[in-house]
Amino acid sequence: MKSNPAIQAAIDLTAGAAGGTACVLTGQPFDTMKVKMQTFPDLYRGLTDCCLKTYSQVGFRGFYKGTSPALIANIAENSVLFMCYGFCQQVVRKVVGLDQQAKLSDLQNAAAGSFASAFAALVLCPTELVKCRLQTMYEMETSGKIAASQNTVWSVVKEIFRKDGPLGFYHGLSSTLLREVPGYFFFFGGYELSRSFFASGRSKDELGPVPLMLSGGFGGICLWLAVYPVDCIKSRIQVLSMTGKQTGLVRTFLSIVKNEGITALYSGLKPTMIRAFPANGALFLAYEYSRKLMMNQLEAW
């Protein structure tokens, strides 16, 4: 049975949601450490110091601050990302004059992923804003930048809406787009290139779970090495906007370089690299297997 575009989009969306869930459940503690170290590099000497201080100050739950919005963010982002990825693959086929069922090259898949990420950024930005603020709430309060308040998802959402209205949820959108669009070119490019390496002449669809996870991890490494400084700037903009200071991408970049040096743009890189392999490996494993399961069910039906 040949699926219509609506059914195919629904399958890609559902598989993307499964991948996003797996990604968060696998890598959330490392993401929390990353955001803390990006936003307050002077407070932590490194990953181990950040972990120990977080545990002593807030307990084990401190590693999972922002998990609810992170789940929402990743499910929303990856649902839209993979749904649009399938659509953008068709657009690339039309642009280069290929048949609708033709296999794309690794470079063409990378371009499709880059285009798709622009749509995903629109749903990711609001939820990631809430996540980043929750993850750094303790540091913001103890440093005196904001008054002590209730640290829940709902309280953060209400505060953003009260201060800035609906558009307040898009603090850091330009830096999010600047991270996502080039970043996902390397993400999907690295993933597809790695899958081609493991397939070595066979179909990529025949790859087992270990090559899939390694390919996903390699894609994640490629993404973060390419755009990590932009992610650091984005975290600063989204967290420090709590104080009412609205600084843009360029001003934030210049301020970090002038006051802290260029190395500050790489604060938190270690937990990000550690997280990249298991989290992105789990993402693609869940995506590929759930998508294959649904496609098989559709063909049988």
UniProtKB/Swiss-Prot annotation:
Pfam families: Mito_carr. Inhibited by pyridoxal 5'-phosphate as well as by mercurials (mersalyl, p-chloromercuribenzene sulfonate, and mercuric chloride), N-ethylmaleimide and spermine. Solcar repeats lie at residues 7-91, 104-197, 207-293. InterPro entries: Mitochondrial_Carrier, Mitochondrial_sb/sol_carrier, Mt_carrier_dom_sf. One of its GO terms (biological process) is L-lysine transmembrane transport. Keywords: Antiport, Membrane, Mitochondrion, Mitochondrion inner membrane, Repeat, Transmembrane, Transmembrane helix, Transport. The keyword Amino-acid biosynthesis does not apply. GO terms for molecular function: antiporter activity; L-arginine transmembrane transporter activity; L-lysine transmembrane transporter activity. The chain crosses the membrane at residues 5-25, 68-88, 110-130, 168-188, 207-227, 237-257. It catalyses: L-citrulline(in) + L-ornithine(out) + H(+)(in) = L-citrulline(out) + L-ornithine(in) + H(+)(out); L-ornithine(in) + L-arginine(out) = L-ornithine(out) + L-arginine(in); L-ornithine(out) + L-lysine(in) = L-ornithine(in) + L-lysine(out); L-lysine(out) + H(+)(in) = L-lysine(in) + H(+)(out). One of its GO terms (cellular component) is mitochondrial inner membrane. It comes from the Eukaryota. It is found in: Mitochondrion inner membrane; Mitochondrion membrane. It is a multi-pass membrane protein. Widely expressed, with highest levels in the liver, testis and kidney. In the brain, expressed at high levels in the hypothalamus. Belongs to the mitochondrial carrier (TC 2.A.29) family. Mitochondrial ornithine-citrulline antiporter. Catalyzes the exchange between cytosolic ornithine and mitochondrial citrulline plus an H(+), the proton compensates the positive charge of ornithine thus leading to an electroneutral transport. Plays a crucial role in the urea cycle, by connecting the cytosolic and the intramitochondrial reactions of the urea cycle. Lysine and arginine are also transported by the antiport mechanism. In addition, catalyzes an electroneutral exchange of ornithine or lysine for H(+), a reaction driven by the pH gradient across the inner membrane. This is Mitochondrial ornithine transporter 1. It comes from Mus musculus. The gene is Slc25a15.
